[in-house]
Amino acid sequence: MPRARQSGRHRRPEPLAAPEGAPALVLAVPGTPSSASRSLAEEVSSIARSELPGLDARIGYVDGGDDEFPSLEAVLTRAAAEQKAREDVDGRPDPGPAAVVVPLLAGPDSALLRRIRQAMMNSGSGAELTDVLGPHPLLAEALHVRLSEAGLARADRARLFTVATAADGIILATVGGDEAVQAAGITGMLLSARLAVPVLAAALDEEGAISRTAEQLRGSGSQALALAPYLIGPEIADGLVGAAAAEAGCASAEALGAYGAVGRLVLSNYAASVGITLPTQAQGVPVR
């Protein structure tokens, strides 16, 4: 005899999947294309797909231009052509965009975002652009994890929340000018609340900014400093973080990379753009 269908609040929710014909999610990857940036982007895309089965996730490189690393413009042009082919078969126009572009950036970088918008315009795809991933509490969690992995902060294995730190001052390193530093400062306040130590944001792409920030922290009483990159990774040249940390006389953690929250925030931005309601955890809201 068939099992009776559950009802009420204990009923198992219907599995979430991408709607048929939903726009492609195109991850805009900055920086010089490499096997490392491709691997990272593929892992982030995989996280997004695992949260939303059926998601058409693609990768476009802002500085790409060949089959191995296709440019953002080329990926969007192809998505638009595929949408047009579907419209011809269906005999009716698709009301939505061909793609939604999500920048793989923790914070704003106006010069890079201008290039992304230009690629979108050149493609003629009518694609939509989401916000960058931060500021967000989950990025503060990711920074905490990277610091703990480097031995620069103790990890609370139960909840990763409000614990003592091995460093008594944190420099949050970003790129993208004053706007990026201000945005990083918001996540920095969240990180400071978690670790109970001062956190100041500084620009990696401004000469001497990291060293000046280190001196500011030391002048306020901090001695054991740590540099935490508020960066996904591909947007900066190899060795830049290490060089800045050495100049400032402090240890450094790894970039955020393909931490799980990064993939969930990518999906959350996409879902908000196309009107898909995600479960709480997939929306990038910390679960307490």
What are these regions (language model features)?
Residues 1-288:
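Active-site-proximal alpha-helix that buttresses catalytic centers in soluble enzyme cores
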